[in-house]
């Protein structure tokens, strides 16, 4: 049986795309995934160009694959994702043993590219932007648990001064309304209970509705997804404050399947830096969104993204970021030191802040957010949380784990329940009382009496 090894860098969109690469190759050639590159007939790197380290890591990994290619000339080596889109044929020039190079919008052409490489003996490069056609050529999604990702749009049209995404994934293009609903319904029929709607900027979604001229905005899409039988929870990422509309805020009042958790990247706490980033909103406007959401959902947890050390960032600018962190009380953050990306406007800005200063700022920021995350977890001890059971605990397979609405993993034991009955709980919603908070998980006891034998604690 032929096998494919896929290494994924970067965001959840890339995770989704990697799953689709595996689906496409399985449907076309019967390839099955492997975790061992030495066993693979096809090795793919799904790349990220958001930060320089991620980009260089790709070429480092390619160097290690070179020996495998030398031992097995029939091995197919491919590079996809945003680095592929940005670098194109120069990847082959730098690593001549690479067979195929493809972008995020052309992953559906992967079998054709591999076939052309085998027939012609020449490397194949396709990093074009054929809009949204890839979704018309993808096989049905494979379900591997009660949660699933569904891409609703591609690209970004915001052109933040530091970001390469518009250049590597193209402009915003939304999937048709009915196509998204059909994919979610198909997943629900296979046992999926929670969907995460994906896009570089999901709240810019504007999907075609049938053969009409009407368009569905993101709030309407959320409303219809919530009506699909079997779907219990809806998450989404990533959203942009500039397009967080009043309709979307109101959805939190009417749509109870939207979880009490939101990832809303702010990037910085200084208006001066936000303007240099071309983010299109002020700190006050961002805080207004959070205030309105918390008026509707007082317990909603907020996660975000921060960039530290953007060109021109002063101590006063960073202090404003810390003020925002304390005021909002973030539950989590993806925080990074600014990494200049070639071809972006910010790459030309003067930057005289020492790296050591940036590193100290990042450590201070992340330590503060980590402490707040721990405080929130401790505050959950004694509460009863509704969790979606996802499968066996990673540390103890005899136990189960689930996830709370605010995205925390809860491990729990059911020692009196036979293993077969425990397995049947995967995909079910259970109430658990949180009894202990750990740095990266919670411990709970089941409190719900169920007809399938789960006892009350």
From Swiss-Prot:
All residue ranges annotated as the Radical SAM core domain in the record: 142-375
GO molecular function, one term: N6-isopentenyladenosine methylthiotransferase activity
Keywords from the UniProt entry: 4Fe-4S, Cytoplasm, Iron, Iron-sulfur, Metal-binding, S-adenosyl-L-methionine, Transferase, tRNA processing
InterPro entries: Elp3/MiaA/NifB-like_rSAM, Methylthiotransferase, Methylthiotransferase_CS, Methylthiotransferase_N, Methylthiotransferase_N_sf, MiaB_methiolase, rSAM, rSAM_horseshoe
Residues binding [4Fe-4S] cluster 2, per UniProt: 156, 160, 163
PANTHER family the record matches: CDK5 REGULATORY SUBUNIT-ASSOCIATED PROTEIN 1, MITOCHONDRIAL TRNA METHYLTHIOTRANSFERASE CDK5RAP1
Function: Catalyzes the methylthiolation of N6-(dimethylallyl)adenosine (i(6)A), leading to the formation of 2-methylthio-N6-(dimethylallyl)adenosine (ms(2)i(6)A) at position 37 in tRNAs that read codons beginning with uridine.
Protein name: tRNA-2-methylthio-N(6)-dimethylallyladenosine synthase
Native organism: Ralstonia nicotianae (strain ATCC BAA-1114 / GMI1000) (Ralstonia solanacearum)
Gene: miaB
């Amino acid at each position: 049986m032929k096998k494919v090894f896929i290494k994924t860098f970067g965001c959840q969109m890339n995770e989704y795309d990697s799953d689709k690469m595996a689906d496409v190759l399985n449907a076309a050639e019967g390839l099955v995934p492997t975790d061992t590159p030495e066993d693979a007939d096809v090795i793919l790197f799904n790349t990220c160009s958001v930060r320089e380290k991620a980009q260089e890591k790709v070429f480092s990994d390619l160097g290690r694959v070179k020996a495998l290619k030398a031992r097995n000339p029939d091995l197919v080596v491919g590079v996809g994702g945003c680095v592929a889109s940005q670098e194109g044929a120069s990847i082959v020039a730098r690593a001549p043993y690479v067979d195929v190079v493809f972008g995020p919008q052309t992953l559906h052409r992967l079998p054709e590219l591999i076939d052309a490489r085998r027939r012609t003996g020449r490397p194949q490069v396709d990093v074009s932007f054929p809009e949204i056609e890839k979704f018309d050529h993808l096989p049905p999604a494979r379900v591997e648990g009660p949660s699933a990702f569904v891409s609703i749009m591609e690209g970004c049209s915001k052109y933040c001064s530091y970001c390469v995404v518009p250049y590597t994934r193209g402009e915003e293009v939304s999937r048709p309304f009915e196509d998204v609903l059909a994919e979610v319904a198909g997943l629900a029929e296979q046992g999926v209970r929670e969907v995460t709607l994906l896009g570089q900027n999901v709240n810019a979604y504007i999907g075609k509705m049938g053969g009409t001229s009407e368009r569905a905005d993101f709030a309407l899409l959320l409303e219809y997804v919530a009506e699909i039988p079997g779907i219990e929870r809806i998450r989404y990422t990533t959203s942009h404050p500039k397009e967080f509309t009043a309709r979307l805020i109101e959805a939190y009042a009417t749509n109870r399947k939207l979880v009490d958790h939101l990832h809303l990247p702010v990037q910085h706490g200084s208006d001066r830096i936000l303007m240099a980033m071309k983010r299109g909103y002020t700190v006050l406007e961002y805080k207004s969104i959070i205030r309105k959401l918390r008026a509707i959902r007082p317990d909603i947890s907020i996660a975000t993204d921060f960039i530290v050390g953007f060109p021109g960032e002063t101590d006063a600018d960073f202090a404003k970021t810390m003020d925002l962190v304390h005021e909002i009380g973030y539950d989590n953050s993806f925080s990074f030191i600014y990494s200049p990306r070639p071809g972006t406007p910010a790459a030309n800005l003067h930057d005289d802040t020492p790296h050591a200063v940036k590193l100290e700022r990042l450590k201070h920021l992340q330590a503060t957010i980590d402490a707040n995350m721990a405080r929130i977890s401790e505050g959950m001890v004694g509460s009863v949380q509704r969790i979606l059971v996802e499968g066996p605990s990673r540390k103890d397979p005899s136990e189960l784990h689930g996830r709370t609405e605010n995205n925390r993993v809860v491990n729990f034991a059911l020692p009196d329940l036979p293993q077969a009955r425990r397995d049947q709980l995967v995909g079910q919603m259970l109430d658990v009382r949180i009894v202990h908070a750990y740095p990266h998980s919670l411990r709970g006891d089941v409190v719900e009496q169920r007809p399938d034998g789960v006892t009350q604690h």
